[in-house]
Amino acid sequence: MATTPDPSRRRLLGSLAFGACNAILPVGWSADEPGLESSARSTRRVGIAAAGWAGVPCVSVELRDEEQQRVLRTGGNGPTYAIVPVPFSAGTLEVDVAAELTGRGAPEARGFVGVSFHVDEAAETYEAVYLRMTNGRLNRPMPPAPRIDRAVQYVAHPGFHYAVSRERYPGRYEKGADIGLGLWHRLRLEVERSRLRAMVDGREVLAVDDLRYAGREGPIGLWIDDGTRGYFRRLRIS
């Protein structure tokens, strides 16, 4: 169960709206262009823009051209996220996510989209839970084994990405899920000390009891990876 935020932190939270997209963010931020895109920041690796997907307003996050080319040369799994500068250590993160393939990634691109947290000051180390949308059980045709059991993933950067956890602890940090490419899904992360519970559309899909950066406070990230355009809306942090 997620921890209850400190009352003083609650007083720092307000609400901004982007069409049908709501984000709970610190009071005092610019409301000239209210919404998720006015609080999330692009980085040298990813760009963020106002968008619409499946009939609803949202923001899109995608690798910049030079980063996409680097990923094709050397592989992904880097700090590829737009920064939402809200201090977070423990509590609950919720956001609607969707993804599409850009056609610019490797053949193994799976529609990678999720949330990073416990991000350090340099925005280089982090933990994340992400979805591989093409590996979900709602795709038609359904993906073959073992992909169908690899739709949700926990990682810590650097040093603990899927290849490491898959080799050392097969099936422990990745699970199957009822998700699909091009569909909206509600991703919820509950973080308490070294424990994490991940839910998709109200159903628990992954539990981790040994977070690598437990207790670290830092911003969160709207995370994507190779060959993916990720869509985000209704971000909520509590």
PLM features: residue spans?
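N-terminal secretory signal peptides
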Residues: 1-8, 18-22
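Extracellular glycan-recognition regions
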Residues: 31-238
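Hydrophobic alpha-helical targeting segments used for export or membrane insertion
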Residues: 12-13
